Amino acid sequence: MPAPILDIFVDGACKGNPGIGGWGVLMRYGQHEKVLMGAQWHTTNNRMELTAAIEALKAIKRPCPILISTDSVYVKNGITHWLPVWKKNNWRNASKKPIKNIELWQALDQLNQRYEIEWRWVKGHAGNPGNEIADELANRAIESLRQKTS
């Protein structure tokens, strides 16, 4: 009997871009659910999207098949298409400029190599329950950080 799939939904949010940002993760494995979230000052939406994926992968306890759903075309295309080219070009884009968020992409690349992962893009704010929960967590993290400093 094959192992169940670890179903992960990741999302990032930013109030201002750059501005205060948050990330949220919903992880489902069989009947078990885990949520993660965090926030940062002076960040971007893309950084929060990447951070959500990184934190999700860091939280995995043991190898299993993984499906990661993101509403970020940047993350989905980056990890599935652009990353091999960036690495071959010494972490530079087609214009020969260093890629943005290099430290996050390198961290995600290392974690991505540890597991068997299928990356899936989902339309944001379109009623996908897992994506809606991850989005809610990201926004809740932003509000929590705001309240801590008010």
Swiss-Prot record:
The keyword Disulfide bond does not apply. GO terms for molecular function: magnesium ion binding; nucleic acid binding; RNA-DNA hybrid ribonuclease activity. Binds 1 Mg(2+) ion per subunit. May bind a second metal ion at a regulatory site, or after substrate binding. Gene3D superfamilies: Ribonuclease H-like superfamily/Ribonuclease H (3.30.420.10). GO terms for cellular component: cytoplasm. One of its GO terms (biological process) is DNA replication, removal of RNA primer. It is found in: Cytoplasm. Residues 2-143 form the RNase H type-1 domain. Keywords: Cytoplasm, Endonuclease, Hydrolase, Magnesium, Metal-binding, Nuclease. The keyword Magnesium applies. Its EC number is 3.1.26.4. It catalyses: Endonucleolytic cleavage to 5'-phosphomonoester. Mg(2+) 1 binds at D11, E49, D71. Its cofactor is Mg(2+). Mg(2+) 2 binds at D11, D135. Its main location: cytoplasm. Monomer. PANTHER family: RIBONUCLEASE H1 (PTHR10642:SF26). Endonuclease that specifically degrades the RNA of RNA-DNA hybrids. Belongs to the RNase H family. This is Ribonuclease H. It comes from Dichelobacter nodosus (strain VCS1703A). The lineage of its organism: Bacteria, Pseudomonadati, Pseudomonadota, Gammaproteobacteria, Cardiobacteriales.
